[in-house]
Amino acid sequence: MKLFQLILILLILCTTYPANASRDTNSYDGNIFPIYAGNGAIVPPQTTLEESLKNQRVSVLFFYLDDSSDSKAMAPVISGLDLIWRNNIDLIALTTDELQSDKSKSNSNQPNYYWNGLIPQTIILDSQGEVRFDMNGMVNIDDLNKIIGELKGIDISDSKFSVESINEYNSIISEKK
């Protein structure tokens, strides 16, 4: 019996695989916001685009895939926006999986109206629903802050922020002096 237990323990220890997650690969590691940005509160979004437009709030749409290295790299920037602007904007981060099957782009109250088919895509809508920023790929957080600040009437021209990596999985947003 002891020999059986010893063999079983050895098999368990020898056949386990390490948990690997890598920001620089197009592999699925789980939701990118808790893993790479340390902020699992971003998803699911706290509001819908339709509600945000109805309430005339500035909205930031972020289209991503959990298995995209570019989306993983943008996660700390989007998390930084949430940290800085949480009570002033509606941040709506959406995976594009469900949007790929919905080809209708006629309703501007729905996110797929704005998605151009590429990821990551960051869009800023003003309180009237007009697109004020639309860019694919990596975006500088200061560029986003400048546009949001202008739309909210808040002067943040003296503030500059940077995304600093703590390790491969976590980053922080800090203000540059």
Role assignments for model-derived ranges:
Residues 2-9:
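Sec-dependent signal peptide recognition
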Residues 14-18:
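N-terminal signal peptide c-region/cleavage motif recognized by signal peptidases
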Residues 20-48:
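N-terminal "domain-start" segment that seeds a small globular fold
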Residues 42, 56, 67-74, 115-118, ...:
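Solvent-exposed, acidic/flexible segments
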Residues 46-50, 70-85:
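Typically the conserved alpha-helix immediately C-terminal to a functionally engaged Cys/Sec
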Residues 50-67:
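Short active-site neighborhood of thiol/selenol oxidoreductases, capturing the structured segment around
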Residues 79, 90-132, 141, 148-152:
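Thioredoxin-like thiol-disulfide oxidoreductase module
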Residues 137-177:
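Thiol-/selenol-based redox modules, centered on thioredoxin-like
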